[in-house]
Amino acid sequence: MAISKAWISLLLALAVVLSAPAARAEEAAAAEEGGDAAAEAVLTLDADGFDEAVAKHPFMVVEFYAPWCGHCKKLAPEYEKAAQELSKHDPPIVLAKVDANDEKNKPLATKYEIQGFPTLKIFRNQGKNIQEYKGPREAEGIVEYLKKQVGPASKEIKSPEDATNLIDDKKIYIVGIFSELSGTEYTNFIEVAEKLRSDYDFGHTLHANHLPRGDAAVERPLVRLFKPFDELVVDSKDFDVTALEKFIDASSTPKVVTFDKNPDNHPYLLKFFQSSAAKAMLFLNFSTGPFESFKSVYYGAAEEFKDKEIKFLIGDIEASQGAFQYFGLREDQVPLIIIQDGESKKFLKAHVEPDQIVSWLKEYFDGKLSPFRKSEPIPEVNDEPVKVVVADNVHDFVFKSGKNVLVEFYAPWCGHCKKLAPILDEAATTLKSDKDVVIAKMDATANDVPSEFDVQGYPTLYFVTPSGKMVPYESGRTADEIVDFIKKNKETAGQAKEKAESAPAEPLKDEL
């Protein structure tokens, strides 16, 4: 199962913060102070004129932001500088922004699946093609990245000099080698380049010998992917669009992804955590003696199990605080290895030794391991208006209590959650005499969220009745609106019993 965007942002943000020098911190603070300055080149949009603005421009970048967001404030001056520079481009490249925290603009945030701030999206062809912006966040980098994005998706390589200028030995570069720039193979290659241009750089050529390590006798057509890790070059002759996308995806991630302070590794980390495949993660201290012996064994294990549906990561504890928080790990368990499978079940081996890694992985593949669950301790005292639930008691509390439960999944750092907290307290106090109703909350950063709940952002609220009916709460955020919703939708004990009795009985099953 892929990790939510909000958590991926936290995982990588912590690594970036840890790697940034003090001077960067001072610059960021200065930027935050000036972040509210009026922008001139950035186009300000709202729900009323958004569609019209998108329809006017064949290419436009839109930042969805919140005024209280620190990262948005840091981006603001860089985004404005980039907008000023890009306004001189021929044709001009338009940068815009939308306050997604404004009530009137929230439908836009929902429509475009905005789950964190700031989120930047590229609108192409009057909004017919929408892609995530995956480039730098400083002015010079934004300008360079967007100039590439408005050009052709794939650039023709006509000479060795072109190849030298385009193919960076520190980045992934994908080249289509053809006998002629036409036909199904070429068309499919350009289609994939257009679709994936936000993620990769593409080129095409009629002359394989122009390329690094080129071979004039190469059998064409061919796709050659250059990368700064593992085997450095990998080829494919399958030009089916889906097959080509899978080839690029599989080939563009290291056999073992490294989670450290090096920002060059962050694109691979992003792909790793976004993948729906099972993930094996070894965390240890990179600066201690045993690191090399662990690394050798772990890379060997990744090679041994390369045909399994699993990806591998090795992480330095100094850069992995976000991962430890997400998975519920502790530094006193290091060295440790943890697996998250495609269904989000986790399996943990703390204090692992190098010679235990392969055998433990085999036990996982053989289905012999018991899952690990992240949970805070069950509260000994739980007498506040809003009750605290944790992973170890959420099923009993929410699904087996015989009550109507409004449960909030929150993050301690979430601004919206902080605003909602006193409102939920007020609603719970109003309803305290109703023995059929409970309002509860779970820290979703410190507990595994049950699979029954789809939590993609914070706060997320669900209303669960005694009969098991479960609906997302998407009504108003005032205490009166919450109370009104609960009163209209709650079940009495008698109603719940009637629904349970009228439900069709499940057929008996032979467990053998």
UniProtKB/Swiss-Prot annotation:
GO terms, molecular function: protein disulfide isomerase activity
Q: Which pairs are disulfide-linked?
A: 69-72, 414-417
* Known role: Probable protein disulfide isomerase that plays an essential role in the segregation of proglutelin and prolamin polypeptides within the ER lumen of endosperm. Required to retain proglutelin in the cisternal ER lumen until ER export and, thereby, indirectly prevents heterotypic interactions with prolamin polypeptides.
Location of the region described as Disordered in the Swiss-Prot/TrEMBL record: 492-512
Where is the motif (Prevents secretion from ER)?
A: 509-512
Keywords annotated in UniProt: Disulfide bond, Endoplasmic reticulum, Glycoprotein, Isomerase, Redox-active center, Repeat, Signal
EC number(s) on file: 5.3.4.1
- Please identify the protein, giving its name as recorded: Protein disulfide isomerase-like 1-1
Q: Where is this site: Lowers pKa of C-terminal Cys of second active site?
A: 477
Enumerate the active-site residues: 69, 72, 414, 417
Q: Which family does it belong to?
A: Belongs to the protein disulfide isomerase family.
Q: Which SUPFAM superfamilies match?
A: Thioredoxin-like
**In the UniProt record for this chain, what is stated about the effect of gene disruption?**
Accumulation of large quantities of glutelin precursor (proglutelin) in the endosperm.
Instruction: Name where it's found.
Output: Endoplasmic reticulum lumen
Q: Name one GO biological process term.
A: endosperm development
Induction remarks: By dithiothreitol-induced endoplasmic reticulum (ER) stress response.
